[in-house]
UniProtKB/Swiss-Prot annotation:
It is an enzyme of class 3 (hydrolase). Its cofactor is a divalent metal cation. InterPro entries: DNase_TatD-rel_CS, Metal_Hydrolase, TatD-like. It comes from Geobacillus stearothermophilus (Bacillus stearothermophilus). The keyword Membrane does not apply. Belongs to the metallo-dependent hydrolases superfamily. TatD-type hydrolase family. Binds 2 divalent metal cations per subunit. This is Uncharacterized metal-dependent hydrolase in metS 3'region.
Length: 49
């Protein structure tokens, strides 16, 4: 069981392939990902995720 303790999956770079990124992480044994916001919009997006 692995935890990614600092990820920016809320960044625009992941808009098109977010699900694939998460699935690849799961396939490698990552069970939890902490998404970090760096401004108000990314904080809101982190909460959504």
């Amino acid at each position: 069981m692995l935890f990614d303790t600092h990820a920016h999956l809320n960044a625009v770079q992941y808009e098109e392939d977010l699900e694939q990124v998460i699935e690849r992480a799961r396939a490698e044994g990552v069970s939890h990902i902490v998404v970090v916001g760096f401004d108000r919009p990314t904080i809101d997006r982190a909460i959504e995720l």
